[in-house]
């Protein structure tokens, strides 16, 4: 399910949209997962401003260094330490970073079902078209999603 969306022009960088996207979410946020393009202090600060207990899962860049802030290590610093100690693949497994692939799958569904490009010409109309596409996709996903129940095997 897509819980927030925005359409910007090519002059807007993705990390600058973290705040506006989070503002669209009415429910408590427990976790934010994003790709490495979002790595950086501004993203972490924006997320922290929206709630204290939000877990941030963003892979640090390969050139990342720990922050020089005094006090306890930041979430990003803990990610860097874990990667240094156990490796990037172990970090991905421990943080469940692989869940991000579900987001990529959803975007693939959008492009396959709604279309790979917008049809409207004006920017405001394109924003409306994108929002309508998200609403349609969410309705389709909700309709077709099975209600799964985890069952434990019965001992013989």
Where are these regions (language model features)?
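A short, flexible helix-boundary coil/loop motif
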Residues: 80-86, 114-117, 142-156
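Helix-centered, glycine/charged polyanion-binding patches within enzymatic domains
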Residues: 36-112, 120, 124
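C-terminal/domain-terminus segments
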Residues: 118, 123, 130-132
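Short, residue-level hotspots on alpha-helical faces of the histone-fold
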Residues: 105-108, 134-138
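Polybasic low-complexity intrinsically disordered regions
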Residues: 1-53, 57-61, 68, 72, ...
